[in-house]
């Protein structure tokens, strides 16, 4: 087991401890009285092993079957279970066996037990799919003589067993409707009504591929302060030039400000994409497709992108031990003032940027005048040129600008766009309605390198998948003279 701390994108974290037969999750944020996720739970996690001869003790005594991992037909399938040590391609199984339910005075009782269980499953899988990847190659008779690089690859899956908490009536059906679990048996079945012994829901699974395409806002969210002004930043727009999350303060927040005069906005940004004041998920599915025309080209009406300063993607990266986040830049040319320390209802102590933090326009001016960047982008020159550049991108109807941050420190500038309306769409022809593209530059030398590129590039693509499930392709368009 590689990871003993599970850091969620909403800022909460759990200590993961091996216990007999499985793994225990314990919250590190016990001071959160209104937390939706319970402070702890235990999952039974084990690995099935195929064997030609089933072990003599593979079938436990009748009186112990309630505690064992024995299921009907296990002996016939000639499988035995072993202790989980490292993930396998598709032989791991789990179920929730125990939930810590503290007094309602300490934690808010669940309004929907099913959704609470779904949250625990999501957190458990979030930890599991951060464990070392198993060998994906399939060992088949047809490919027995094939070199390893040519062998077919399978899907990394973990199976959910109908044991423990999952024996609840209609629970698996609800989880399947949420899109969290799946089954390849998509028939109605011959049983007129389902029973506890029914096998129709006994072979549910979650694949890594599907898990990372589920928007985490469906299952993980945090509560905002009762007074929204406590989250307003001391910026000209009362829109956060977010101090993107660090390891100590993963959720960005701001200090009080006085919303007076013409600067008071209609939009009050929240504390990141996971904040909720209604005790409900912050995710909504994409709207129905409507069409419009741009320069004679018919394309879907696009949803509005995130607001200036809004953090729209957060994730802890174990391999570098840092939080990666993406936010929309702010046009204001004034440096971000010091905001001291603050607190939110979703995390503990909040660390904010120092007085010397440059504005986004200052960063863009610095990066665009780097000879390496200027040669590719051609946007070097006085600050007025970068201001016009940023203004044009903030008013674009088919793209929006992005600032990437490592532990709160900006490192690069990006643009996420819809290919069909972009000039690239006209050049390649046949672009799909929901194809997206990315422009990119890394401005800080300390964050260059192939390892970090692979991380933030896959994260940008990940966001594109989450933003609209209809997106099937994400494109890059390097210059013809780009040697890399």
From Swiss-Prot:
Its pathway? Siderophore biosynthesis
Primary localization class, coarse? cytoplasm
Its induction note reads:
Expression is not affected by iron availability and is not regulated by the iron regulator sreA.
Outcome of gene disruption:
Decreases ferricrocin (FC) biosynthesis during iron starvation and completely blocks FC biosynthesis during iron-replete growth. Blocks conidial accumulation of FC-derived hydroxyferricrocin (HFC) under iron-replete conditions, which delays germination and decreases the size of conidia and their resistance to oxidative stress.
Q: Where is the active site?
A: 477
Q: Which GO terms describe its cellular component?
A: cytosol
Q: Where is this region: Disordered?
A: 51-81, 240-264, 335-355
An example molecular function term from Gene Ontology annotations: N-acyltransferase activity
Source taxon at top rank:
Eukaryota
Protein purpose: Acyltransferase; part of the siderophore biosynthetic pathway. Aspergillus fumigatus produces 4 types of siderophores, low-molecular-mass iron chelators, including excreted fusarinine C (FsC) and triacetylfusarinine C (TAFC) for iron uptake and intacellular ferricrocin (FC) for hyphal and hydroxyferricrocin (HFC) for conidial iron distribution and storage. TAFC consists of 3 N(2)-acetyl-N(5)-anhydromevalonyl-N(5)-hydroxyornithine residues cyclically linked by ester bonds; FC is a cyclic hexapeptide with the structure Gly-Ser-Gly-(N(5)-acetyl-N(5)-hydroxyornithine)x3.
Name of this protein: Acyltransferase sidL
Q: Which organism is it from?
A: Aspergillus fumigatus (strain ATCC MYA-4609 / CBS 101355 / FGSC A1100 / Af293)
């Amino acid at each position: 087991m590689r990871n003993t701390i599970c850091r969620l994108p909403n800022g909460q974290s759990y200590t993961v401890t091996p216990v007999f037969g499985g793994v225990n999750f314990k919250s590190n944020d016990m001071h959160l009285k209104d937390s939706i996720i319970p402070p702890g739970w235990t999952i039974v996690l084990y690995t099935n092993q195929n064997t030609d001869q089933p072990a003599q003790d593979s079938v436990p005594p009748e009186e112990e079957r309630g505690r064992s991992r024995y299921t009907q037909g296990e002996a016939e399938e000639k499988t035995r279970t072993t202790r989980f040590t490292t993930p396998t391609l598709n032989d791991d199984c789990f179920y929730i066996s125990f939930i810590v339910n503290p007094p309602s005075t300490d934690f808010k009782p669940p309004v929907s037990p099913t959704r609470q269980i779904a949250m625990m499953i999501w957190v458990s899988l979030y930890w599991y799919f951060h464990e070392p990847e198993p060998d994906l190659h399939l060992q088949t008779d047809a490919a027995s003589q094939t070199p390893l690089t040519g062998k077919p690859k399978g899907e990394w899956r973990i199976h959910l067993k109908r044991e423990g908490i999952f024996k609840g009536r209609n629970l698996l059906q609800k989880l399947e409707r949420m899109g969290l679990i799946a089954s390849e048996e998509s028939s109605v079945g011959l049983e007129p009504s389902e029973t506890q012994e029914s096998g129709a829901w006994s072979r549910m699974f979650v694949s890594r591929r599907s898990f990372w395409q589920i928007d985490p806002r469906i299952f993980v969210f945090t509560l905002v302060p009762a007074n929204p002004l406590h989250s307003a930043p001391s910026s000209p727009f009362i829109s956060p030039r977010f101090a993107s999350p660090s390891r100590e303060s993963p959720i960005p927040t701001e200090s009080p400000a006085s919303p007076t005069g013409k600067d008071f906005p209609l939009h009050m940004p929240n504390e990141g994409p996971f904040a909720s004041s209604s005790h409900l998920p912050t995710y909504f599915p994409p709207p129905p497709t409507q069409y419009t025309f741009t320069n004679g080209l018919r394309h879907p009406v696009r949803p509005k992108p995130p607001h200036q300063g809004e953090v729209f993607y957060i994730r802890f990266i174990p391999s570098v031990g840092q939080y990666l986040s993406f936010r929309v830049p702010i046009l204001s040319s004034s440096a971000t003032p010091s905001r001291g320390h603050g607190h939110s209802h979703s995390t503990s102590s909040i660390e904010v940027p120092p007085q010397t933090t440059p504005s986004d326009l200052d960063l863009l001016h610095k990066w665009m005048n780097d000879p390496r960047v200027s040669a590719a982008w051609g946007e070097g020159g006085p600050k007025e040129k970068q201001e016009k550049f940023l203004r044009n991108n903030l008013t674009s109807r088919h793209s929006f600008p992005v600032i990437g941050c490592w532990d709160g420190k900006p490192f690069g500038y990006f643009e996420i766009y819809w290919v069909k309306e972009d000039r690239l769409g006209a050049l390649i022809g046949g672009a799909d309605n929901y194809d997206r593209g990315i422009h990119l530059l890394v401005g800080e030398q300390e964050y260059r390198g192939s390892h970090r590129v692979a991380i933030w590039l896959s994260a940008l693509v990940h966001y594109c998948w989450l933003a609209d499930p209809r997106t099937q392709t994400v494109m890059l368009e390097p210059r013809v003279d780009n040697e890399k």
